[in-house]
Structures are given as C-alpha cells and as structure tokens.
C-alpha cells in the first residue's frame, strides 16, 4: 500500500513540474480547412491503349461516366474504365506481343488459355470481362427480351426469383470476382461465379 502511494505521489510531482515549464510551450496557429475541389471527370473517349498498334484497344463507352447514375456512380465507372480496364488492355498487349496470341481474338485466347500463365489469364480475363460489362449496360436501363424472360421464368420460376438468386450469388462471392448468367451444356440457364478475372469461357 505504501509503495502504491509513493508511486502516485511521484507521478503527481512529475506531472506538476512538467506543467510548470511555460517557457517550453510553443504557440501554433491551426490553419482553416481548405476547400476540396471536386475532381473533374474525364471523357471516356480520351482513354486509349498505350500501344496504338497493339492487338487490343479500348472500345469506348456508349455513355458518359455518369450515364448510369443513380445505379452506378460516375467515379466508380471512371475508375473501372480509365484505370482498371485500360490497365488490363495495356498489360494484355505487352503479354501477347511477339507471340502467336497476338493474332487471336480475345475469345480465342480465353477458350484455349493455359491457366498457368497468370499474366495472360488475369489481363485477358480483365479485358474481356470489362468489355462485356460495359457493353451490356445501357444509360436508360432496358428490359429483357421476351426470349430471355421466357428462359428465365422456365429455369428459375420467375424473374424475381432469378434476381434474388443472382443477388445472393454476388453477395456471397468472397473478394473480387464476377457473377454470370450462362447456359449450361443442356441449354439450361444457370448462375455461376468466377474469382478475380476468370470467366466461363
């Protein structure tokens, strides 16, 4: 008990002594917060592959970065198109340059992919997946065709049930990846998932 009182007393004395040293205090002025300027969005048409002669190029977007709002915000679209997608395009061009893959379509590359070649697997997948993603979205939304709706109703019971299962698959996907609606070998519509930049091809 005496030791505890002694320690507390010493701590108090040190605290009082350090508080009494006014000559060591320095007055500072805290600046007012700066206004943060909102970054201007670029134009998707300005995004080009580094190698203009490369086998793969940027296809362009049929809408502005903010064209899918409120469902997908402009910053997300700009990041995916002008950073991720062009990055996959540039790295894919580098990976296939001077190889027999340089003359192949992206679909041909993916269908006969050597899964051990990570640079081609990731960048070809990222290039294809993002092209597909951007192509199927429309600025004003859209409706499924009668043929697609009929197939969805046949294989999932209803469009609402399909949306629920599709959303559930996306929610359960751990990390980055994709959710796909595809036909299996029997022609039945099924929902599948792939990790990272893999795809059903």
Placement of each model-derived feature along the sequence:
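Feature for soluble, non-membrane regions of globular proteins
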Residues: 4, 20-201
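Sec-dependent N-terminal signal peptides
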Residues: 5-13
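C-terminal motif of bacterial Sec signal peptides marking the signal peptidase cleavage site
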Residues: 15-18
């Amino acid at each position: 008990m005496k030791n505890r009182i002694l320690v507390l007393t010493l701590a108090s004395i040190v605290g009082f002594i350090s508080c009494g040293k006014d000559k060591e205090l320095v007055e500072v002025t805290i600046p007012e917060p700066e206004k943060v300027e909102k970054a201007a969005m670029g134009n998707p048409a300005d995004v080009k592959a580094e190698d203009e002669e490369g086998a793969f190029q940027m296809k362009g977007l049929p809408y502005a970065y903010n064209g899918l709002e409120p469902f997908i915000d402009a910053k997300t679209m700009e990041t995916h198109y002008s950073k991720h997608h062009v990055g996959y395009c540039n790295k894919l061009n580098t990976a296939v340059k001077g190889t027999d893959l340089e003359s192949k379509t992206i679909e041909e590359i993916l269908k006969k992919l050597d899964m051990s070649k990570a640079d081609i697997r990731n960048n070809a997948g990222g290039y294809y997946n993002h092209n597909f993603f951007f192509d199927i979205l429309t600025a004003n939304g859209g409706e499924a065709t009668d043929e697609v709706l009929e197939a969805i109703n046949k294989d999932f019971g209803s469009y609402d049930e399909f949306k629920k299962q599709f959303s559930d698959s996306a929610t359960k996907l751990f990390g980055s990846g994709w959710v796909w609606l595809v036909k299996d070998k029997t022609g039945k519509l099924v929902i599948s998932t792939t990790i990272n930049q893999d795809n059903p091809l």
